[in-house]
Amino acid sequence: MIDFTNKLKKRELPKRINPIEIYESLDRRSEAGPLRPSQKKILEEWFNKRKNERDNIIKLHTGEGKTLIGLLILQSKINETNAPCIYICPNIYLAKQAVKDAEKFGIPYCIIDQSKTIPDDFLAGRKILITHVQKLFNGKTAFGLGSKSIQVDSIILDDSQACIDAI
């Protein structure tokens, strides 16, 4: 008799950590075409030279795709570390827009819903948490304080100046 057990086992493919390769592998909507040259250049620079630096600033004009760049960088970090990553917007409106972008490009994400509990997919480093600054920085933060706080591997502040003003 033939044993097909070895053939039927799922083989885990290595996770891509290059954000450009991640983008090319995403199940994105047809209206989402290839990366723009400026996006590709920034992602190449980050991946090849700045990936291990603690603080990075990416500056682009409105509408040039900063949200997508940030989400791809966080997905790269998740694929590499399996650790929690968070995308923080200055307000709820921009957080909802970032969610739409994640859906459009097929990037796995989660949000803090009405239950106000931190999603398990975020804590386990499976999905990017998209939220707004007021969810993190308030007297009743769900992220905890001091020794009871949640450790986050990577944080992207969308429009950091506006986020800082809100804090």
Q: Over which residues does each language-model region extend?
A:
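N-terminal helicase ATP-binding lobe
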Residues: 1-167
